[in-house]
Amino acid sequence: MSASSQSRPTTIACLLGPTASGKTAAALALAARRPIEIVSVDSALVYRDMDIGTAKPSRDERASVPHHLIDIIDPADAYSAAEFRADTLRLIGEIVARGRTPLLAGGTMLYYKALTQGLNDLPGADPEVRAALDADAARDGWPALHARLAQVDPDTAARLAPNDSQRIQRALEIFMLSGQPMSALLAAPRRTDDAAAAYRFVPVALEPSDRAVLHARIAQRFDAMLDAGFIDEVERLRRRDDLHPDLPSMRCVGYRQAWEFLDGDTDYRTMRDKGIFATRQLCKRQITWLRAMPERIVVDCIAPDSTARALDALERVLDGRTPD
């Protein structure tokens, strides 16, 4: 046996929660007490020039504690769960080697699942296949492609809305490249490796005891983003020749709705309402993912002392005062 297989895994604290649950405040509170470096678990924060609509940590916040996996790619590019897993495992090793403590923080549960449970053996993105599907959608509409998906992968089609362009495209792409439905590939055993075996990931979950309070926070935060110049931010991105609404970056919550408004497809009030609704739907999905983790340590994110509670939970994890 190798020395690494005999040694006790290094515990990694993971601060997870839906949007507007107070993750940044809790992470910064921990940074004030311990030499941590924050590794973002957020699929929107990877993009440069998308600051307001992603609620990216401020320049001062990022100066007070090292942050990783923020502003690492251009909005015209894509970033996969596989890339996140490889980057995060590398960063954890580097942070530990520096004698500091990594803290994973974010709300992209697909990334967290890929990190901790491994990856499904799905084919990578193929630009030619995607271009062909985009052309079909432009001609026939996404509901027609949804109907096509229902013929080859009824299980996946049944859980997707007819206009969910990103997921419909990906499911059809997988079938065209592999000859197998995505649902069957996802049901297959995950591809595992020893890369994550050196670590024990412990999730601290910020969850609301009353969703109405979190929904009010979401509305307040979206309005604050609008006041801070979110529409201008999207307009600057829109003026680029290489961006369009079907890119993963522009599908981020809020950006799609702002793009529709700038295209003249909706009025301002409708854009605001749709942006808030989309954020609430994202929050609902994030909470569903969290509640499927029986090992998580739950902190009520709407409690008056939620930051202190989260800080205490994180310190208990890092001090080894949690059950194995």
Curated annotation (Swiss-Prot):
Region (Interaction with substrate tRNA), start-end ranges: 42-45, 166-170, 251-256, 284-291
Reactions catalysed: adenosine(37) in tRNA + dimethylallyl diphosphate = N(6)-dimethylallyladenosine(37) in tRNA + diphosphate
Enzyme class, first EC level, given as a word: transferase
Keywords in alphabetical order: ATP-binding, Magnesium, Nucleotide-binding, Transferase, tRNA processing
Gene Ontology biological process: tRNA modification
UniProt site positions, description: Interaction with substrate tRNA: 108, 130
Listed transmembrane segments: none
Swiss-Prot/TrEMBL cofactor(s): Mg(2+)
Keyword S-adenosyl-L-methionine: no
GO molecular function terms attached to this record: ATP binding; tRNA dimethylallyltransferase activity
Residues at which ATP binds: 17-24
EC number(s) per entry: 2.5.1.75
Residues where substrate binds: 19-24
ATP-binding is among the record's keywords: yes
Cited PANTHER family: TRNA DIMETHYLALLYLTRANSFERASE
Protein purpose: Catalyzes the transfer of a dimethylallyl group onto the adenine at position 37 in tRNAs that read codons beginning with uridine, leading to the formation of N6-(dimethylallyl)adenosine (i(6)A).
Family: Belongs to the IPP transferase family.
NCBIfam families in the record: miaA
Assembly, per entry: Monomer.
Protein name: tRNA dimethylallyltransferase
Gene: miaA
